[in-house]
């Protein structure tokens, strides 16, 4: 008898392939089922908000995966998905709450006044008194809009809609359907958080990595200056590009952080990070919250500092070992994305407190690539425009 470890992936691939209406190998099936499940079904298990909408949305994505094929009418399907996604975001505009953009606006005001934005409690945060725990890239991203006195939520809304337009223009119906219908993505597009913009910056960084490891190092260095979470893809990048990729990341990071380090020093920045880490005294959207829902009482926070960082270290080790075992063959693009995603999820969610909004940081790259990784074909005549951007990759 063959071991179940051999038969199970093939059986799952056949089942997913039946739903999709085409034959899939286990890797393709994992991407086709895994991305919608992560963004649609996992949040739907959390009580409250409108996350339950992820269940019918998952069915809609399955229908898109089965029905939308290359042909003369597919442009209409893409336009309908695009319109539905924009309408969903308009319906949920302002739903939910986050004080991140309020803090960012106040931090920019302090920076313009010649003061440090770090290690300060901002009264306009939710709840009042939270610090600014982000980097210079975040300040630079929002600065032009803050100077024009825009409501920064509209920046997030525009970025979210721009992603939908780009996915439609590339002819990627599955990624477009996931991005359009995911309740979490529609909510964080205007709830006052900065995760949508962080996801766009990370998308650009990872697409640069697809074009070359040194470019990827520069991109991740810049993205890490927005939120440190982007550095989850560093181990895979270094295993691909070696010391040149690492040097590019370090130099880009130094260029981003040098003005802040020279003007205010590392102390206030590190203090803001420690301050932000200790703000939340309740377990939610995390491993601790999952366990607490079963035990019925409050769980202590200290074990989850261990699970978070020890688990992250184990995943980093697994990524490095996997990449080393593949040598001299290069790490595949799918394996590179999956390794960084695993580090990202473990470090952020095997913790005491986390946020549903963090999923918006990885959603753009997943929606951008899921059609290709699942073996789907672009579906309309704008394909030549997409091909011009399909450059040779070091991730073979």
Each model region followed by its residue ranges:
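Bacterial/eukaryotic Sec-type N-terminal signal peptides
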Residues: 1-2, 396
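Primarily membrane-embedded glycan-assembly and transfer machineries that use lipid-linked glycans
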Residues: 2-206, 210, 214, 241-363, ...
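Transmembrane helices and adjacent periplasmic/lumenal helix-loop junctions
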Residues: 218-239, 352-358
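Preference for long, amphipathic alpha-helical scaffolds in soluble/luminal domains
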Residues: 220, 232, 256-257, 383
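A juxtamembrane structural motif centered on a specific transmembrane helix
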Residues: 370-396
């Amino acid at each position: 008898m063959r071991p179940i470890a051999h038969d199970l992936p093939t059986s799952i691939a056949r089942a997913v392939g039946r739903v999709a209406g085409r034959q899939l190998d286990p890797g393709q099936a994992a991407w086709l089922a895994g991305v919608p499940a992560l963004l649609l079904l996992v949040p739907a298990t959390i009580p409250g908000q409108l996350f339950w909408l992820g269940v019918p949305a998952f069915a809609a994505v399955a229908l898109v995966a089965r029905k939308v094929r290359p042909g003369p009418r597919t442009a209409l399907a893409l336009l309908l998905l695009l319109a539905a996604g924009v309408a969903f975001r308009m319906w949920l505009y302002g739903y939910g709450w986050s004080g991140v953009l309020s803090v960012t606006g106040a931090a920019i005001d302090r920076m313009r006044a010649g003061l440090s934005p770090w290690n300060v409690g901002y009264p306009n945060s939710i709840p009042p008194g939270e610090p600014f725990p982000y980097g210079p890239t975040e300040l630079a991203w929002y600065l032009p809009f803050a100077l024009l006195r825009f409501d920064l939520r509209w920046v997030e809304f525009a970025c979210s809609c721009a992603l939908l337009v780009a996915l439609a223009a590339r002819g990627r119906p599955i990624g477009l359907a996931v991005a359009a219908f995911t309740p979490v993505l529609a909510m964080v597009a205007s709830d006052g958080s900065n995760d949508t913009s962080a996801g766009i910056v990370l998308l650009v960084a990872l697409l640069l990595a697809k074009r070359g490891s040194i470019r990827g190092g520069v991109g991740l260095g810049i993205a890490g200056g927005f939120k440190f979470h982007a550095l989850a893809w560093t181990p895979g990048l270094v295993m691909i590009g070696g010391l040149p990729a690492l040097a590019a990341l370090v130099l880009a990071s130094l260029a981003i952080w040098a003005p802040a380090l020279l003007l205010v020093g590392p102390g206030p920045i590190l203090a803001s990070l420690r301050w932000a880490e200790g703000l939340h005294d309740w377990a939610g959207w995390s491993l601790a919250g999952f366990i607490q829902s079963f035990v019925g009482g409050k769980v202590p926070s200290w074990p989850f500092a261990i699970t978070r960082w020890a688990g992250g270290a184990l995943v980093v080790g697994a990524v490095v070992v996997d990449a080393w075992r593949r040598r001299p063959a290069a790490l595949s693009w799918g394996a590179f994305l999956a390794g960084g995603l695993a580090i990202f999820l473990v470090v952020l969610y095997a913790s005491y407190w986390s946020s549903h909004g963090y999923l918006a940081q990885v959603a753009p790259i997943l929606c951008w690539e899921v059609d290709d990784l699942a073996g789907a074909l672009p579906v309309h005549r704008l394909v030549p425009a997409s091909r011009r951007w399909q450059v040779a990759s070091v991730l073979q």
